[in-house]
């Protein structure tokens, strides 16, 4: 028997399962679990080793080696997932007060018996070990998504949450996950995780891990982050030792499952974070294969910034009798705290206009600017150009090694390099609270990505500015963009309005203007070690910042 902080003893498990709980009566399981069939053994054969994807499209073949699971719910060990007990203050509110609170915070709820929102942390009914950590982080009150999302997730129901990026949704599912874990049997050797969180990018996965690590400390909850682009060894070690929480990108998780490095038979709390983005990136087949390996009576929480038909279909297929909360408009809309400036330009004007904006933005040394490009090549070329012109810019995209990406993100977060150039794939995982400006050097492929990009600024109640270069090549998107700008009461460039009237075809051939040449492949050394050419380019003599 070994003691773990937080006022309870962690029992070694004999023939019966013991609850991890015991902090605060409300969440203790107390039923005991018969050791009988258990979770152990058995799983090994469930995961074939799969012969890889030789000669075919690797992405489409991912998961081909996973065996179909036949779930007999009668023989599976029972588990606890309903923990919510309504606070007397919440119960005492009239229906009218509840409706007024929801209206004030732009909440729309759907589904059967949706619990009422909570207005402060104490009303959520979290155990003290969770509450004290929340308060230690300095949060004053729950965000809108947390007010409604916590009672929903703690109730054990399947949940859909739609809210803008930066709304606090990570804690909305992380804190109930900790409560859920503490009510489950301890892991036995060979057991997989209890909580699985799927995310679209490495950066977002790491950000989620940071959050859950803070709040899981007092319960000694172990977690690991499983994503591509780094060696598998440390991830395999973590999984083999046993973790209660696995945060993963779909591709690398399937690799681990096919190789028999872990299994999902113990997963009873599944989170799909940024579901819309995962589908945009083509992960739907992998998500479906992963979910097929998880017991069907699990609790599933799906979080998304938008609610397109593809995400609705995923919810219909994998969630049971779900309840839904939407913060803000159900239509595609931008954060109203962001000032949106759209300039109709030609490709060859972009460079000079970018410099003019940066000169103004960087007058305030506390500002941070995130620049989005359409391709990795353009990201590198712009970064090289800016550095040679004396601007402290660094780039981040999918081709860069994880070590370099982490270094770039840290340089940006700390303000050492206040200009970061990124592609869409990197954008969703970037969680930097104090980005003041977003500059869309290239307009994205769709309006959802535009919303996500500009949502990197104006987070946590702050104001932000988004500057967008729009060319005739983008004219097919003009109507959607004008709709977004109009809804947010933004000024509209007359040339953009004109495009809506005459749109239908794209513009000219839309080359990259002065950026047409191929970037060099030089190695070079940056301050953080050996990095790719653009980030290693020396800063020009005429320092601009």
UniProtKB/Swiss-Prot annotation:
<feature type="compositionally biased region" description="Gly residues">
    <location>
        <begin position="24"/>
        <end position="39"/>
    </location>
</feature>
<keyword id="KW-0963">Cytoplasm</keyword>
<feature type="domain" description="Helicase ATP-binding">
    <location>
        <begin position="150"/>
        <end position="325"/>
    </location>
</feature>
<dbReference type="InterPro" id="IPR011545">
    <property type="entry name" value="DEAD/DEAH_box_helicase_dom"/>
</dbReference>
<dbReference type="GO" id="GO:0003724">
    <property type="term" value="F:RNA helicase activity"/>
</dbReference>
<keyword id="KW-0547">Nucleotide-binding</keyword>
<comment type="similarity">
    <text>Belongs to the DEAD box helicase family. DDX5/DBP2 subfamily.</text>
</comment>
<dbReference type="GO" id="GO:0016887">
    <property type="term" value="F:ATP hydrolysis activity"/>
</dbReference>
<feature type="short sequence motif" description="Q motif">
    <location>
        <begin position="119"/>
        <end position="147"/>
    </location>
</feature>
<dbReference type="GO" id="GO:0005634">
    <property type="term" value="C:nucleus"/>
</dbReference>
<keyword id="KW-0067">ATP-binding</keyword>
<protein>
    <recommendedName>
        <fullName>ATP-dependent RNA helicase dbp2</fullName>
        <ecNumber>3.6.4.13</ecNumber>
    </recommendedName>
</protein>
<keyword id="KW-0866">Nonsense-mediated mRNA decay</keyword>
<keyword id="KW-0539">Nucleus</keyword>
<dbReference type="InterPro" id="IPR001650">
    <property type="entry name" value="Helicase_C-like"/>
</dbReference>
<dbReference type="GO" id="GO:0005524">
    <property type="term" value="F:ATP binding"/>
</dbReference>
<keyword id="KW-0378">Hydrolase</keyword>
<feature type="region of interest" description="Disordered">
    <location>
        <begin position="1"/>
        <end position="39"/>
    </location>
</feature>
<keyword id="KW-0690">Ribosome biogenesis</keyword>
<dbReference type="InterPro" id="IPR014014">
    <property type="entry name" value="RNA_helicase_DEAD_Q_motif"/>
</dbReference>
<comment type="subunit">
    <text>Associates with polysomes.</text>
</comment>
<feature type="binding site">
    <location>
        <begin position="163"/>
        <end position="170"/>
    </location>
    <ligand>
        <name>ATP</name>
    </ligand>
</feature>
<dbReference type="GO" id="GO:0005737">
    <property type="term" value="C:cytoplasm"/>
</dbReference>
<keyword id="KW-0694">RNA-binding</keyword>
<feature type="compositionally biased region" description="Basic and acidic residues">
    <location>
        <begin position="10"/>
        <end position="23"/>
    </location>
</feature>
<feature type="region of interest" description="Disordered">
    <location>
        <begin position="513"/>
        <end position="545"/>
    </location>
</feature>
<dbReference type="GO" id="GO:0000184">
    <property type="term" value="P:nuclear-transcribed mRNA catabolic process, nonsense-mediated decay"/>
</dbReference>
<feature type="short sequence motif" description="DEAD box">
    <location>
        <begin position="273"/>
        <end position="276"/>
    </location>
</feature>
<feature type="domain" description="Helicase C-terminal">
    <location>
        <begin position="353"/>
        <end position="500"/>
    </location>
</feature>
<keyword id="KW-0698">rRNA processing</keyword>
<comment type="function">
    <text>ATP-dependent RNA helicase involved nonsense-mediated mRNA decay and ribosome biogenesis through rRNA processing.</text>
</comment>
<dbReference type="GO" id="GO:0006364">
    <property type="term" value="P:rRNA processing"/>
</dbReference>
<dbReference type="InterPro" id="IPR000629">
    <property type="entry name" value="RNA-helicase_DEAD-box_CS"/>
</dbReference>
<dbReference type="InterPro" id="IPR014001">
    <property type="entry name" value="Helicase_ATP-bd"/>
</dbReference>
<keyword id="KW-0347">Helicase</keyword>
<feature type="compositionally biased region" description="Gly residues">
    <location>
        <begin position="513"/>
        <end position="529"/>
    </location>
</feature>
<dbReference type="Pfam" id="PF00271">
    <property type="entry name" value="Helicase_C"/>
</dbReference>
<dbReference type="Pfam" id="PF00270">
    <property type="entry name" value="DEAD"/>
</dbReference>
<dbReference type="GO" id="GO:0003723">
    <property type="term" value="F:RNA binding"/>
</dbReference>
<dbReference type="InterPro" id="IPR027417">
    <property type="entry name" value="P-loop_NTPase"/>
</dbReference>
């Amino acid at each position: 028997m070994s003691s773990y902080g937080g006022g309870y003893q962690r029992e070694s498990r004999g023939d019966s399962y013991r609850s991890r709980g015991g902090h605060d009566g409300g969440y203790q399981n107390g039923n005991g679990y018969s050791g009988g069939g258990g979770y152990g053994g058995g799983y090994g054969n469930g995961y074939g080793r799969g012969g890889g994807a030789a000669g075919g499209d690797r992405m489409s073949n991912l998961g081909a080696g996973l065996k179909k699971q036949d779930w007999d719910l009668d023989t599976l060990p029972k588990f606890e997932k309903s923990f919510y007990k309504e606070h007397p203050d919440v119960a005492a509110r009239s229906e009218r007060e509840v409706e007024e609170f929801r209206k004030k915070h732009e909440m729309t709820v759907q589904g059967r018996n949706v619990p009422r929102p909570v207005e402060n942390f104490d009303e959520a009914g979290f155990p003290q070990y969770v509450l004290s950590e929340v308060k230690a982080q300095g949060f004053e009150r729950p965000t809108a998504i947390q007010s409604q999302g916590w009672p929903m997730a703690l109730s054990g129901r399947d949940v859909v949450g739609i809210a803008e990026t930066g709304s606090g949704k990570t804690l909305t599912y992380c804190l109930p996950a900790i409560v859920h874990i503490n009510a489950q049997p301890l892991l036995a050797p060979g057991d997989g995780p209890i909580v699985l969180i799927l995310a679209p990018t490495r950066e977002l996965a790491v950000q989620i891990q940071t959050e859950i690590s803070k709040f899981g400390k007092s319960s000694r909850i172990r977690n690991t982050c499983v994503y591509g682009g780094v060696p598998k060894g440390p991830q395999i070690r973590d999984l083999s030792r046993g973790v209660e929480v696995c945060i993963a990108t779909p591709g690398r998780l399937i690799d681990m499952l096919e190789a028999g490095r872990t299994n999902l038979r113990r997963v009873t709390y599944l989170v799909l974070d940024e579901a819309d983005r995962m589908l945009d990136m083509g992960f739907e087949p992998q998500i479906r294969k992963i979910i097929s390996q998880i017991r069907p009576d699990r609790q599933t929480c799906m979080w998304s910034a938008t609610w397109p038909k593809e995400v609705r279909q995923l919810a219909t297929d994998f969630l049971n009798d779900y309840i839904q909360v939407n913060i803000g408009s159900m239509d595609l809309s931008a954060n109203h705290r962001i000032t949106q400036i759209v300039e109709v330009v030609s490709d060859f004007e972009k460079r000079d206009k970018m410099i003019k904006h940066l000169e103004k933005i960087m007058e305030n040394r506390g500002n941070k600017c995130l620049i989005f490009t359409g391709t990795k090549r353009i990201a590198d070329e712009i970064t090289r150009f800016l550095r040679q012109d004396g601007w402290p810019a660094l780039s981040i995209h999918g081709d860069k090694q994880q070590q370099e990406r982490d270094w770039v993100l840290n340089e940006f977060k700390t303000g050492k390099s206040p200009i970061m150039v990124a592609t869409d794939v990197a954008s969703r995982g970037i969680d930097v609270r104090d980005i003041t400006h977003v500059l869309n050097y290239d307009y994205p492929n769709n309006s959802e990505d535009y919303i996500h990009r500009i949502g990197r600024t104006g987070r946590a109640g702050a104001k932000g500015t988004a500057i967008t270069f729009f060319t005739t090549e983008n004219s097919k998107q003009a109507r959607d963009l004008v709709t977004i700008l109009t809804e947010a009461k933004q000024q509209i460039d007359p040339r953009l309005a004109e495009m809506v009237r005459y749109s239908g075809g794209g513009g000219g051939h839309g080359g990259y203007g002065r950026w047409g040449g191929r970037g060099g492949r030089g190695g070079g050394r940056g301050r953080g070690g050996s990095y790719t050419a653009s980030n290693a380019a020396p800063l020009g003599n005429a320092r601009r910042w």
